[in-house]
């Protein structure tokens, strides 16, 4: 996620320099249950303003950044643990395993099971 800092497009609006780092840090620390309204409260910003600022700075919305974090962590866990796909789904913040499978396939182009089988590192 930190890679998004080099894609910042501040344009004519000026954002607090550390805002993006604060957002990304929050996602890193609260990926299981992080909520945009909680982040806004912590940082003291209006939800609509912060949503727009995140999109402008990264090209992605808050939910997309959160999903990227969750899915990349899930991929790491698939390759480096023996946890079940269902357990990994819950570990990264998805209560609905079917939804997790769908998002994983959309993001990586293959199912979690196929990902583990094709890219497996011996554990």
Predicted feature descriptions by range:
Residues 21-25, 29, 56-95, 117-123:
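Terminal helix-turn-helix DNA-binding modules in bacterial transcription factors
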Residues 17:
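AAA+ ATPase active-site-proximal loops
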Residues 33, 37-69, 89-114:
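Basic/polar phosphate-binding segments, predominantly the helix-turn-helix DNA-binding elements
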Residues 1-12, 22-38, 53-54, 58, ...:
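Basic, amphipathic alpha-helical hairpins
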